[in-house]
Amino acid sequence: MAKLHDYYKSDVVNELSKQFGYKTIMQVPRIEKITLNMGVGEAISDKKLLENAAADMAAISGQKPLITKARKSVAGFKIREGYPIGCKVTLRGERMWEFLERLICISVPRIRDFRGLNAKAFDGRGNYSMGVREQIIFPEIDYDKVDRVRGLDITITTSANTDEEGRALLAAFNFPFRK
């Protein structure tokens, strides 16, 4: 079991119960899933770019990504409905906890000119979204084998009802939020 999951069960649940006055531990917010999304708009002209992006995503997450397709045709972007234009991975359970641990402890500190994560990037329901500009911050990516630096979106879905609860949950995991 991941260290972060043990820490959640032993310390975070008690801490949040006291802070928000929950009556049962089932009311305490928890992380339900982490979604990684990588849009590869250039894949229209070169299919190899999407394969490389999917390989990077698989290395980062430890799971085979789902290829996302365009929902509708857009003439301005020269895409048609059904064209493969990106990939995504949904992490739950043990893989989710391991990824979160690597994200907080290893990857986020490797971001260039890092001054903390935006504490206002919550969606109103306690879910947190962040963007990463370079996939090379993850230790699983070999810098020499990268064909192109790509960014990805990371969404952390929680069972929190408010942004305040979600922020307290992530802050309990020592997320480096900007002051």
Curated annotation (Swiss-Prot):
One of its GO terms (cellular component) is ribonucleoprotein complex. It comes from Aeromonas hydrophila subsp. hydrophila (strain ATCC 7966 / DSM 30187 / BCRC 13018 / CCUG 14551 / JCM 1027 / KCTC 2358 / NCIMB 9240 / NCTC 8049). SUPFAM superfamilies: RL5-like. Signal peptide: none annotated. This is one of the proteins that bind and probably mediate the attachment of the 5S RNA into the large ribosomal subunit, where it forms part of the central protuberance. In the 70S ribosome it contacts protein S13 of the 30S subunit (bridge B1b), connecting the 2 subunits; this bridge is implicated in subunit movement. Contacts the P site tRNA; the 5S rRNA and some of its associated proteins might help stabilize positioning of ribosome-bound tRNAs. It comes from the Bacteria. This is Large ribosomal subunit protein uL5. GO terms for molecular function: rRNA binding; structural constituent of ribosome; tRNA binding. Part of the 50S ribosomal subunit; part of the 5S rRNA/L5/L18/L25 subcomplex. Contacts the 5S rRNA and the P site tRNA. Forms a bridge to the 30S subunit in the 70S ribosome. The keyword RNA-binding applies. HAMAP family: Ribosomal_uL5_B. One of its GO terms (biological process) is translation. Belongs to the universal ribosomal protein uL5 family. Keywords: Ribonucleoprotein, Ribosomal protein, RNA-binding, rRNA-binding, tRNA-binding. InterPro entries: Ribosomal_uL5, Ribosomal_uL5_bac-type, Ribosomal_uL5_C, Ribosomal_uL5_CS, Ribosomal_uL5_dom_sf, Ribosomal_uL5_N.
